[in-house]
Amino acid sequence: MSNISTDLQDVEKIIVLDYGSQYNQLISRRIREIGVFSELKSHKISAAEVREVNPVGIILSGGPNSVYEDGSFDIDPEIFELGIPILGICYGMQLLTHKLGGKVVPAGDAGNREYGQSTLTHTPSALFESTPDEQTVLMSHGDAVTEIPADFVRTGTSADCPYAAIENPDKHIYGIQFHPEVRHSVYGNDILRNFALNICKAKGDWSMDNFIDMQIKKIRETVGDKRVLLGLSGGVDSSVVGVLLQKAIGDQLICIFVDHGLLRKGEADQVMDMLGGKFGLNIVKADAAKRFLDKLAGVSDPEQKRKIIGNEFVYVFDDEASKLKDVKFLAQGTLYTDVIESGTDTAQTIKSHHNVGGLPEDMQFELIEPLNTLYKDEVRALGTELGMPDHIVWRQPFPGPGLAIRVMGEITEEKLETVRESDAILREEIAKAGLDRDIWQYFTVNTGVRSVGVMGDGRTYDYTIAIRAITSIDGMTADFAKIPWEVLQKISVRIVNEVDHVNRIVYDITSKPPATVEWE
């Protein structure tokens, strides 16, 4: 199996070198919000490779390391000689200080360890243009700069950090000890905008319209006269991929809709009617529910579930593709967050995404992932730009493994039915309350836990259903949704009264991190 790259080589971009910060994806996201394309690159990238990527700017992310420890994440020193503007954030500032001849010590030794919001006081600088002389920022550092490199000047301090911002304006190298990418830094977006537009001289013209034109051109060049298979789930991601591919290659696209028996209530019919009927996509439906459920019988480990579903999904494709001629490519709706969360060289795997892991190496297709540089909100914007209606673009996110990862433990038809029915009630009531645009994602989970209850005149011993509802911008971080109590009560009453084998409802009030959005 080979992967067709969707690297946007000719796009004006700022790259973020990944040093393992929990916030590094947010840096990239904030730069995109400014109108400049941005992507993460390994901290191991060489100066020659940076020159090949040809960015207009480089950001060194924060991270958990200490620059003076053996094995800490490093940087090719020649990158500082490329003449490309550089912004070091937190560990990134400490690293550039260390590499360019300054001094970094454990913050405890300097007496200036900082965690949480702090007041930054700055002097005039291109980085802080049009921001107040005093502003609130988020500090999160265990080490500190005590001496700055030659030709650098101090431009910012805080009560506990004498070098909160430094710069060498002649070489366009800047360092800040705080995190501008998080909302707690009140003028963080302005600082990043100053770096991107004023210092890096980026045009700020990145848009979904540009993305469509570039991707259509790239898809046509890649595919030629061959045919492409797309696994259509009816979710936002695969639907947007389908419409984008159809716009690029028309009838060369064949959509295979795999009904794996793990879909939401009424979803199979909706997919065929909506995308096959209204949009005219050529859809082949594969009824494979028994095949998937047989493979999943007795399996309770979530990673194993994902791998099984990922493998079976592609094997079904193989079966369908063998009936067709000139099919060379398989398209997937992999997002940038999927790629990031499946692990980098600075972070452990959070979970294996079915669009990233689990694909057999002997797969006979080449892989096309047109969305793998986009975040979720950008995919919605892309769908709108493609002329797709709101009820598709704003459809609830749904994982490829479907309800398999919303049933804890072993999957049974009874458990699946409790999730299908309870989820339908949840979606209906959230829409009735006018909250469907305010809540980024919401669904129900069969926890696998049974508890004692009383219904009518008898005792019950039935399942506990959890409601998960979160607010987010891009899926990288999330908070639980503050649904009004009266709405939650109505949902709870309906589920226990209308769904068999359920007698208890709980509400998940965990943010991301520490939890992921899905339970498995």
Swiss-Prot record:
Pathway the protein takes part in: Purine metabolism; GMP biosynthesis; GMP from XMP (L-Gln route): step 1/1
Any one GO molecular-function label of the UniProt entry: GMP synthase activity
GO CC annotations on file: cytosol
Domain GMPS ATP-PPase: 206-395
Coiled-coil regions, chain positions: none
Known catalytic reactions: XMP + L-glutamine + ATP + H2O = GMP + L-glutamate + AMP + diphosphate + 2 H(+)
Keyword Metal-binding included in the entry's annotation: no
Record-linked InterPro entries: Class_I_gatase-like, GATASE, GMP_synth_C, GMP_synth_GATase, GMP_synthase, GMPS_ATP_PPase_dom, NAD/GMP_synthase, Rossmann-like_a/b/a_fold
Domain of life (superkingdom): Bacteria
A single BP term in Gene Ontology: GMP biosynthetic process
Gene3D superfamilies: 3.30.300.10, 3.40.50.880, HUPs
Keyword entries, A-Z: ATP-binding, Glutamine amidotransferase, GMP biosynthesis, Ligase, Nucleotide-binding, Purine biosynthesis
Subunit structure: Homodimer.
Record PANTHER family: GMP SYNTHASE [GLUTAMINE-HYDROLYZING], GMP SYNTHASE-RELATED
Name this protein carries in UniProt: GMP synthase [glutamine-hydrolyzing]
Organism: Streptococcus pneumoniae (strain ATCC BAA-255 / R6)
